[in-house]
Amino acid sequence: MNILFVGDVVGQTSGDYLCSRLPKIKRDYSVDLTIVNGENSADGNGITPFSANLLLNGGADIITTGNHSFRRREMNDMYEESDVIIRPANFGDTYGKGYCVFDMGRTRVAVINLLGMAYMDNCDNPFHFVDKILKEIDTPNIIVDFHAEATSEKKAMGYYLEGRVSAVLGTHTHVQTNDEEILGGHTGYITDVGMTGAKRSVLGVDKDVIIARLTTYYPQKHTYPEGDIMINAVVLSIDEKNGRCTEIKKINM
């Protein structure tokens, strides 16, 4: 089976654009399941019920998030009610779930969301936490969205889960890396999938806003520029009988 994983969606305009392109991407890559990181899909940061529904109605099967999961209080009920919108599992005992198991009929796919420790909000140890979760999952097809800042921590998680999960996909930094590989002949890996956001921007945010923040030291409201939008993603080919990743392809369009 082929699984599409789309990097952090930044802002509503980027979400709209992604949804307009998803049908063709799915056809071109024969996609069976689509996972989207939507933690910044709302204008002004975070995720809202509106931006989440936009992605789900536009073709996402599962939405993962990250350190901005709870930036918007209006999402709390949706985290509780939804089986396909997840937040980092090691983010404490709070609203929602840290993993889901998606029933595709012929097989099931588990998706785990984890938050890194380095340079991030306080959270439980993701290495210890993922061990607990894996004991609860009874499918070999397992995708891990590791939302983390440090490359070293992401690489370590890749090796830690080598042979135990189908893929470890880094998110959060919004810059697609050039190190996709299959670890141990089993686990697809990339340090960062990248983002879906404005090309002429600073990590999806209006460049003038970020420059003003860095030169004046005053807080700035995040706004999102108009113009061309890029989509960063990966497509995983997985043997659904044993969960082994046989190919990982980057998308940068």
Predicted features and spans:
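Acidic, metal/ion-coordinating pockets
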Residues: 1-253
